[in-house]
Amino acid sequence: MNKHKKIPLRKCVVTGEMKPKKELIRVVRSKEGEISVDPTGKKNGRGAYLTLDKECILAAKKKNTLQNQFQSQIDDQIFDELLELAEKVKK
């Protein structure tokens, strides 16, 4: 009998698409309220997943999607870091 390994799926908060966890990037808000990018997906706190795509990240910034998810202000530095990661993955 062939056993298939279960692939964890997560929903992108911008597009609403279910994708494999490895195709998405996690942004996390810690208990202290600090928001950071979590490339490993292991940090503690409230997480939100974004598709690692420039258009998706810019749409999240424009629509304030992450601010609504975390109910707190998001620095432009977080979006810059996400865009940088998207560029690295694209190459």
UniProtKB/Swiss-Prot annotation:
Pfam families: YlxR. InterPro entries: YlxR, YlxR-like_sf, YlxR_dom. SUPFAM superfamilies: YlxR-like. PANTHER family: BLL0784 PROTEIN, YLXR DOMAIN-CONTAINING PROTEIN. This is Uncharacterized protein YlxR. It comes from Bacillus subtilis (strain 168).
